[in-house]
């Protein structure tokens, strides 16, 4: 890791500007955005649509060519919901698109390029029409979605499970497993008795974290 050679006052000024941008441009786009959010390069984070709720200790890492996008496009005005729990990580290029409901639990990690959707968006033969009814997506606590994984409509993913890189999840995933492939299938079971350290543990003292990294 390279040493930060910036003067301390310049670092503080940069962080203050970043917080200002989040508070004035991103927070108003959310129905709720919790405390201790860390949004890196917030100019490249796109939040749009109604009923977007984001919990505490949210982390988003965006890049100019790999934006982070959270959007609700309901079938009717004001419809559709996204609920993101506490201590969730969204990496560059990750996208969440809801027409009905997407619920993401605490401590979930989205790697680069992950896509989560609850709708097909368009019909196959008439591309001008919206698809059939969307189906909610529920992702439980401490799920890890690998690089460029895709989660499609109607899916539930159980607690602690891992979705491998580029997997396409088309059906429910039980808790404590690893799935891979297209369509995703179980390739390994995790030991539910083994201690698991989560992002919720990491952010158990968020104020202390801020002091540590200051």
Predicted regions and their residues:
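A short, glycine- and basic residue-enriched loop/turn
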Residues: 136-137, 154-155, 176
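Domain-scale signature associated with acetyltransferase and cell-envelope carbohydrate enzymes
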Residues: 1-117, 140-141, 159, 175, ...
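Glycine-rich NAD(P)-binding loop of Rossmann-like domains
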Residues: 77, 129-140
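Short glycine/proline- and charge-enriched loop/turn segments
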Residues: 123-130, 195-201
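Beta-rich strand-turn-strand
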Residues: 93-99, 147-162, 167-171
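Conserved catalytic-core motifs of eukaryotic protein kinase domains, centered on the activation segment
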Residues: 120, 127-129, 155, 189-190
């Amino acid at each position: 890791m390279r040493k930060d050679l910036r003067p301390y006052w310049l670092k503080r000024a940069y962080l203050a500007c970043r917080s200002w941008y989040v508070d004035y441009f991103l927070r108003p786009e959310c129905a709720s955005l919790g405390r201790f959010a860390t949004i890196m390069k917030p100019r490249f984070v796109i939040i749009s649509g109604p009923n977007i709720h984001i919990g505490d200790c949210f982390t988003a890492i965006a890049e100019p060519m790999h934006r982070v996008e959270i959007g609700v496009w309901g079938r009717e005005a004001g419809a559709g919901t996204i609920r993101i729990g506490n201590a969730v990580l969204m990496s560059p290029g990750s996208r969440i698109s809801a027409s009905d409901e997407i619920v993401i639990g605490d401590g979930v990690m989205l790697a680069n390029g992950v896509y989560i959707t609850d709708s097909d968006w368009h019909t196959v033969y008439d591309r001008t029409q919206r698809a059939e009814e969307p189906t909610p997506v529920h992702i439980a606590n401490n799920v890890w979605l690998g690089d460029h994984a895709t989660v499609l409509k109607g899916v539930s993913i159980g607690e602690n499970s891992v979705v491998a890189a580029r997997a396409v999840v088309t059906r429910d995933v039980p808790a404590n497993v690893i799935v891979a492939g297209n369509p995703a299938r179980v390739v390994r079971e995790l030991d539910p008795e083994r201690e698991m350290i989560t992002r919720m543990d990491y952010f158990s003292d968020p104020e202390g974290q801020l002091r540590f990294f200051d």
